[in-house]
């Protein structure tokens, strides 16, 4: 029983000492005239009367005292300091809320900053070029009197060595000035971007003649003869007109026979046998060209000319037993000659190919 009473008196004594310490702290803060801050609590003015002092160690003491007081008043629901962690953070946040505005600027400081800013702007404006027409026109006072009151700061050119070329719009002086040509007067004068006189007319870029297409071909497939410069001609214009297909085919056969006679051919041919093969190739190639439908007109070719001089090369070879028959041979050559075109040579029955003469001799 005695121990219970002693503990109760001890608690009351401790509570009294804490309240006394808080009252002393409140009086010291009230007497401090240099205090700047905001009210901390309005619900419990006995706990925190007045204002907390800025940047002092007494704030921490007040916070510790408030936490101790909250321990001895657990049943007080109206106590805002029930949770020590929440109360301490809330007080610190309220204290730091107006810290940015603690320094008040007077009128002299603001005027001084404004004056400095104006000076900096003037210096930048003096260093930069004020206009895009800087030094693009001659200074009239300098030309008339030989002196200018602005000196080096003048925006006009003092002589042709200072004159700069002005970058103009691409359509500058390419259209007529409506005001000048309707009224007879333009307020812009010589600075107008449109044409006042015929001497001011400029040729618009892109309005000149377009370059001719040097790689264009005529309908017949040959290059146009009206081209000016031969530098950009197409590869087809450099080549001569195409030869007949039969002559090209014969040349290929001769080259194959001369260069590599046994590489790709199963049989080797002599020069006379090649002369026999070439007209036959011409005839079969003509027939294949006529059978294919042409969607667009091909390049024009010259009429096919015969490679060999003999008139009896167009007929396909017949069996050996019928070679001695002169009538059938001549009729076949005549029919093939009529197919070959208008420029085929006339029939000469006296001249015969040596191979046919040998075959006819062997038959006899």
Swiss-Prot record:
InterPro entries per UniProt: Tis11B_N, ZFP36-like, Znf_CCCH, Znf_CCCH_sf
Any Gene Ontology CC annotation: ribonucleoprotein complex
One Pfam family from the record: zf-CCCH
Region (Disordered): 102-129, 308-350
GO molecular function: mRNA 3'-UTR AU-rich region binding; zinc ion binding
Tissues expressing the protein: Remains unlocalized in the egg and early embryo. From stage 21 (late neurula), expressed around the pronephros in the anterior crests, pharyngeal arch, hindbrain, mesodermal tissues around the pronephros and tail-bud. This expression pattern is maintained up to the tadpole stage.
Keyword RNA-binding carried by entry: yes
Entry's localization field: Nucleus; Cytoplasm
Positions annotated as zinc finger (C3H1-type): 133-161, 171-199
SMART domains tied to this protein: ZnF_C3H1
Post-translational modification: Phosphorylated.
Chain spans, region RNA-binding: 150-191
Annotated keywords: Cytoplasm, Developmental protein, Metal-binding, Nucleus, Repeat, Ribonucleoprotein, RNA-binding, Zinc, Zinc-finger
Compositionally biased tracts (Low complexity): 113-123, 329-348
Motif (RNA-binding): 133-138
GO biological process: one example: nuclear-transcribed mRNA catabolic process, deadenylation-independent decay
Compositional bias annotation for Basic and acidic residues: 102-111
Lineage top rank: taxon: Eukaryota
Function noted in UniProt: Zinc-finger RNA-binding protein that destabilizes several cytoplasmic AU-rich element (ARE)-containing mRNA transcripts by promoting their poly(A) tail removal or deadenylation, and hence provide a mechanism for attenuating protein synthesis. Acts as a 3'-untranslated region (UTR) ARE mRNA-binding adapter protein to communicate signaling events to the mRNA decay machinery.
Protein name per its UniProtKB record: mRNA decay activator protein ZFP36L2-B
Organism encoding this protein: Xenopus laevis (African clawed frog)
Gene symbol of the encoding locus: zfp36l2-B
């Amino acid at each position: 029983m005695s121990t219970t009473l002693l503990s109760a008196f001890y608690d009351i004594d401790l509570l009294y000492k804490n309240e006394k310490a808080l009252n002393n702290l409140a009086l010291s803060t009230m007497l401090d005239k240099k205090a700047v801050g905001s009210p901390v609590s309005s619900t419990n003015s006995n706990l925190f009367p007045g204002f907390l002092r800025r940047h002092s160690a007494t704030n921490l003491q007040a916070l510790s005292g408030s936490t101790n007081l909250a321990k001895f008043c657990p049943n007080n629901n109206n106590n805002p300091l029930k949770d020590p962690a929440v109360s301490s953070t809330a007080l610190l946040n309220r204290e730091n809320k107006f810290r940015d505005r603690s320094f008040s600027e007077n009128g002299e400081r603001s005027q001084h900053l404004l004056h400095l800013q104006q000076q900096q702007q003037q210096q930048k404006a003096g260093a930069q070029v004020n206009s895009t027409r800087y030094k693009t026109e001659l200074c009239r006072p300098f030309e008339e009197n030989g002196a200018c009151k602005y000196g080096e700061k003048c925006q006009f050119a003092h002589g042709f060595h200072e004159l700069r070329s002005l970058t103009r719009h691409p359509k500058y002086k390419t259209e007529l000035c409506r005001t000048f040509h309707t009224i007879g007067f333009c307020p812009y004068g010589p600075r107008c971007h449109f044409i006042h006189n015929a001497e001011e007319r400029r040729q618009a870029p892109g309005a000149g003649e377009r370059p001719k297409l040097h790689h264009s071909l005529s309908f017949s497939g040959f290059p146009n003869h009206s081209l000016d410069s031969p530098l950009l001609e197409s590869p087809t214009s450099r080549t001569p007109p195409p030869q007949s297909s039969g002559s090209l085919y014969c040349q290929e056969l001769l080259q194959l026979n001369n260069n590599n006679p046994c590489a790709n051919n199963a049989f080797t041919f002599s020069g006379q046998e090649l002369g026999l093969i070439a007209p036959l190739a011409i005839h079969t190639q003509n027939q294949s060209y006529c059978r294919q439908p042409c969607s667009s007109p091909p390049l024009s070719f010259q009429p096919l000319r015969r490679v060999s001089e003999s008139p009896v090369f167009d007929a396909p070879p017949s069996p050996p037993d019928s070679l001695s028959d002169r009538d059938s041979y001549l009729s076949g050559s005549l029919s093939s000659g009529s197919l070959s075109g208008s420029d085929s040579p006339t029939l000469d029955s006296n001249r015969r190919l040596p191979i046919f003469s040998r075959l006819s001799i062997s038959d006899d």
